[in-house]
């Protein structure tokens, strides 16, 4: 049976869910910031061979939602990850990060150099300035009507209005999830997201980034990542394949897979192939390290 519970962290409690048993666990970090665990539910496919743990970062989903916006910083979420890992007793660990979750994973690794069996990054940039530039290049390819709506409402500061949000959906359906209809887990993440976290750290949209991590960039430190690393993304991903390729070239002992006809949430669009790639990568890492399936 799945295990669920709460962990006390700075600022409140975070909710977690653990499925599967045996093997070295996979701890999964959701994106956003503030986008909840729900859209990562396909990763529970991995639980037939090992324990898989999801949690809602503070400020979203089933976790507490404190009103103190000073909590919404990269250092806070790094220390939250340290606390979650310690509370769950995860001495050995594969760390998976989706989008912002991969950025969090990289910062955690660079700050603490923790013991990890592997790092798995899905649609995660190493540089927000580059992300902003490349997302705006994708924005320029939207239909003129959508671009006009985005420009007009950003100039007026009306980015919460339905017309602006509707134009954003055009971008999302091209570069975030190309499935129609969207999966239920993704819809739940949109409903349960912590938008104050997103707006404080990111800003009003994926390409209009005005928040406190707009200058985040670890490109020059990628060579310090020494654990086996798998970099995953989609052909149409808002985290551009060229960006991921540069990360692959800088991270020693890394592998890279780009899924054709897929986007940011390639684990939905190419689910079976995605899970096979992740399982093969983890199996290879563990075989080279002499880790048995029952470790």
Regions found by a protein language model. Give the residues of each.
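Active-site loop/oxyanion-hole signature of alpha/beta-hydrolase fold enzymes
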Residues: 57-100, 276
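Catalytic active-site module of serine/aspartate enzymes centered on a nucleophile-bearing elbow/loop
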Residues: 254-295
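Flexible "cap/lid" loop of the alpha/beta hydrolase fold
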Residues: 118-158
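N-terminal cap/lid segment of alpha/beta-hydrolase-fold proteins
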Residues: 1-13
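Conserved loop-alpha-helix segment in the C-terminal half of the alpha/beta-hydrolase fold
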Residues: 212, 219-262
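Conserved HGGG/HGGXW glycine-rich cap/lid loop of the alpha/beta-hydrolase fold
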Residues: 12-66, 70
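Alpha/beta-hydrolase
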Residues: 140-142, 148-227, 246
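Conserved hydrolase catalytic core segment
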Residues: 91-134
């Amino acid at each position: 049976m799945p295990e669920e519970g709460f962990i006390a962290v700075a600022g409140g409690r975070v909710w977690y869910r653990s499925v599967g048993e045996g093997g070295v666990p996979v701890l999964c970090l959701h994106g956003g910031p503030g986008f909840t665990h729900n859209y990562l539910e396909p990763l529970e496919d991995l639980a037939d061979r090992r324990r898989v743990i999801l949690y809602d970062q503070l400020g979203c989903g089933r976790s507490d939602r404190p009103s103190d916006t000073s909590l919404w910083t990269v250092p806070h979420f790094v220390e939250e990850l340290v606390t979650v890992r310690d509370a769950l007793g995860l001495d050995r660990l594969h760390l998976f990060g989706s989008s912002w979750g991969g950025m969090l994973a990289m910062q955690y690794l660079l700050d603490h150099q923790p013991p990890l069996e592997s790092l798995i990054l899905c649609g995660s940039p190493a540089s927000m300035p580059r992300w902003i530039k490349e997302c705006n290049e994708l924005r320029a390819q939207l239909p003129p009507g959508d671009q006009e709506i985005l420009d007009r409402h950003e100039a007026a500061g009306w980015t919460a209005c339905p017309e602006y949000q509707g134009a954003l959906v055009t971008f999302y359906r091209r570069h975030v999830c190309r499935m129609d209809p969207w999966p239920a887990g993704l819809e739940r993440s949109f409903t349960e997201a912590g938008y104050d976290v997103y707006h404080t750290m990111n800003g009003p949209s994926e390409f209009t980034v005005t928040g406190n991590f707009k200058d985040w960039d670890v490109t020059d430190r990628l060579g310090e990542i020494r654990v086996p690393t798998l970099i995953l993304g989609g052909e149409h991903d808002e985290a551009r394949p060229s960006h991921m390729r540069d990360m692959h070239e800088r991270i020693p002992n890394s592998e890279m897979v780009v899924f054709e006809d897929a986007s940011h949430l390639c684990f939905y669009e190419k689910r079976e192939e995605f899970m096979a790639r992740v399982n093969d990568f983890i199996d290879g890492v563990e075989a080279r390290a002499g880790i048995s399936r029952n470790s």
